[in-house]
Each structure stands twice: as structure tokens, then as C-alpha cells.
Amino acid sequence: MAPQARGLGLCSLLALQASLAAVFITQEEAHSVLRRQRRANSFLEELRPGSLERECKEELCSFEEAREVFQSTERTKQFWITYNDGDQCASNPCQNGGSCEDQIQSYICFCLADFEGRNCEKNKNDQLICMYENGGCEQYCSDHVGSQRSCRCHEGYTLLPNGVSCTPTVDYPCGKVPALEKRGASNPQGRIVGGKVCPKGECPWQAALMNGSTLLCGGSLLDTHWVVSAAHCFDKLSSLRNLTIVLGEHDLSEHEGDEQVRHVAQLIMPDKYVPGKTDHDIALLRLLQPAALTNNVVPLCLPERNFSESTLATIRFSRVSGWGQLLYRGALARELMAIDVPRLMTQDCVEQSEHKPGSPEVTGNMFCAGYLDGSKDACKGDSGGPHATSYHGTWYLTGVVSWGEGCAAVGHVGVYTRVSRYTEWLSRLMRSKLHHGIQRHPFP
């Protein structure tokens, strides 16, 4: 039995060897199948400068390997930020259905229409209140307890279906400049002392108040029957007989054919105005015959008080216009001049006034605008003219040229009557019955 066992063992060994031969192949064959294609630098790889393609793109690399490529720690760090950045959108940071775009060490969320914020976390509807960017309204905004704010439009406009925009319903809505809209031009800048000519038709609400043939003051057309100006213009006026208002005027030395001359039926000033003083310096004039609205004669919008104080007052630059002196104690302008002036902080204006002996007090019924370097300012003859502010392409009356220390004097700025304080007073009078002559009306 023993020889037979040895024979079986030998057969098994031979069979196993044959099986192994079937499994294992030669070294050359194995290299041709399994061996990775050797890099170009072969065994000299560690002796040659690093390659970005070889070290970090064909396979993952370490910071040290990248450092070999750039030969600079700073450049390596810059590369490493991008290379080792990862997917910043992996945590789904965008909320409320927003989509995420991966950036270097950052991300951008693209929000759905009703949401905003870095992560689309803010619902726009929750922020639709009037104190926040005027509630998104083009003109007037009203807050409501327990419900969303609503937008409204000035007379002569109507609200569009989107609930925020206003479109004109009349041929000549207030605050628009037909001359500019027909040309598709932008609003000009410039003015008075240091200013530029306001091209014909681009200040269509400007009025020239004439005492006989002499320019008395400027004014602003508010509608077809009313012009607003400064009360101090009439300190020495005892009768309306020689007082006229010229609308559509541009060049005082020429008759251009667009002028409209109107007599004044009624002059109204606040009962608190004291001649020779600067407070409550505003006056309302009723035309004896209504103005005819044209491309060169358009009223300026009288804004609601809240809108004026919360929205318009935050706009830095406004336009002032008039035919005042081009230089202090110089000649009056022949053509209508205009300029954009920056509004100043009330506290800064008050402090400047307090530091100048004999300077009138700046009250809450006034505000300041202009350039402290004395480069641009209103001057004698501009008094009563408009300080107009544009919001979403519509112009509003925000001030009346009142007083200043000289004209364009260094360290001095123009002082304007704050029209928002008189909005209700003006509106009430514009609805009143006609009473001829010069009157004082209780304020407020």
C-alpha cells in the first residue's frame, strides 16, 4: 500500500505544478500587462525639477511636491488654495430653493424671485416696508398694519399692474422733462455761480417773477394755476399791479416765442414770516390766467411730506436753477442757468452758521446745500427758484432758494426753505377759493 500512496502523491504534486503554471506568467509577460507606464524621467525623477502636470494632475500631490514645482512657498500657497479647495456647495448652503455655484473658497447662490441674501435667506416680501428703499415703490408708499405695504402715484399718474410702477395719464405730467425725453438724453448738470446754461426746455417748471421789466426772483410752477417762490422777494412789494410771472422763459434778452406772461391774482405768505428775517421764507402765487402746458412749460411735483423727508432727503444731489448773478455783485445771467448741488447734513450746516457772528439761525424749516470750496452756489436773482430732486426719473420740489452769506463764498453754502414742512399748508391753499391781493395765511 505504501508504494501506491507515493504514486498518488507524485501525481498530485505534478497536477498542482501544472495548475500553478496556468496561473502564473513570466516576469516579462507580467510587466507588459500589469506594470504602469513609467514616467518620462524614470529613475531620475527625484533629481529633476518637478512638473505640475506630472506631480499634481496625473495623480494627487502633497504640498511638498507642489512646492518642488513652484520653488516658492507663497506661490505654492496660492496654488494650494485652489487645488485643495473642495466643493463649497456640498453642504447645500442656498436656502429657499436657491441654486449654488462653486467658487474658490466661496460660493454664489442664485435665488428665486422672492428671496435675496447671501444664502437666499431673506424673503423680500418681509422687507416690503416704506422705510426700506421706499418699499420698492416708484413714487409714494403706504405701510399697513397686518398687511403688505402699498404703492401709490402722484396726480396725473396711475399705478401699473406690477403694483410699484407709475405711468402718466396726462400729456404733461408733473416732474417730467419732455425736451429730454424726446431727445432720449440724460439729465444735464451745471448751474448759476460756477454753473452752466440749462438748455431750453430742460428746466420747464422754472418761472421768472418780474416787477415791471425787472427780474425780481425765480419761482416754480406747481400746476396750471400756482407758482411757489420765496417770501422775502416781496418784502418791498405793496401791490400786485406790476407783478407778472413769465413761464417758458429761457433768454431774458430775447423773445423766443415760447414765453407765457401771467398776471398774479393772489400772493400768500405764512403768517409767521417776518420781513427781513429768514424763517418761513416761502410764498404761494395764484395766476390770474392758467398756464398752458407745453414742452417748455411743465409743473414740478409737490411731493407728499413723508416721501420727501424719508426718501428724497437721502438723495445727495439736486438741481437748482435761475437767472441770478454769475458772480458776487456781478451781472445777472442772460440765459437760464442750472447746477446740481450736494445736500449737507443739517448739523454741519447749523454748526457753520453758529461759528459766524451775525449769521441768521438755521432752523428746522431750512436745509443747506452747496460746495464749501465756494465753487458753485445760488446768488442774487436766484431767490425763490427751485431746489428740485429727481427720483426714478420724476422731479420733485424739495426746496426754495432762500439765503446765503454772499455768493459762492468759501466756507459758506446756500440755505433753502425746506418745502416738506409746508406741504400741507401749500396743498390746503391750492384748494382754497380765490381772494385777490396780498394775504398772510396761518401756518401750520
Swiss-Prot record:
Free-text description of this protein's post-translational modifications in UniProt: The vitamin K-dependent, enzymatic carboxylation of some glutamate residues allows the modified protein to bind calcium.
Keyword entries, A-Z: Blood coagulation, Calcium, Cleavage on pair of basic residues, Disulfide bond, EGF-like domain, Gamma-carboxyglutamic acid, Glycoprotein, Hemostasis, Hydrolase, Hydroxylation, Protease, Repeat, Secreted, Serine protease, Signal, Zymogen
Single annotated GO MF: serine-type endopeptidase activity
Propeptide section residues: 22-39
Record EC number: 3.4.21.21
Bridged cysteine pairs (disulfide): 56-61, 89-100, 94-109, 111-120, 130-141, 137-151, 153-166, 174-301, 198-203, 217-233, 349-368, 379-407
Signal peptide (residue range): 1-21
Modification sites for 4-carboxyglutamate: 45-46, 53, 55, 58-59, 64-65, 68, 74
Catalytic activity annotation: Selective cleavage of Arg-|-Ile bond in factor X to form factor Xa
Pfam families (UniProt xref): EGF, FXa_inhibition, Gla, Trypsin
Residues recorded as bearing (3R)-3-hydroxyaspartate in the entry: 102
Organism from which the protein derives: Oryctolagus cuniculus
Family label: Belongs to the peptidase S1 family.
Compartment(s): Secreted
Active site: 232, 281, 383
All copies of domain EGF-like, residue ranges: 85-121, 126-167
Job description of the protein: Initiates the extrinsic pathway of blood coagulation. Serine protease that circulates in the blood in a zymogen form. Factor VII is converted to factor VIIa by factor Xa, factor XIIa, factor IXa, or thrombin by minor proteolysis. In the presence of tissue factor and calcium ions, factor VIIa then converts factor X to factor Xa by limited proteolysis. Factor VIIa also converts factor IX to factor IXa in the presence of tissue factor and calcium.
Official protein name in the record: Coagulation factor VII
Carbohydrate attachment residues: 91, 99, 211, 242, 306
PANTHER family xref list: COAGULATION FACTOR (PTHR24278), COAGULATION FACTOR VII (PTHR24278:SF26)
Keyword Nucleotidyltransferase belongs to the record: no
Subunit: Heterodimer of a light chain and a heavy chain linked by a disulfide bond.
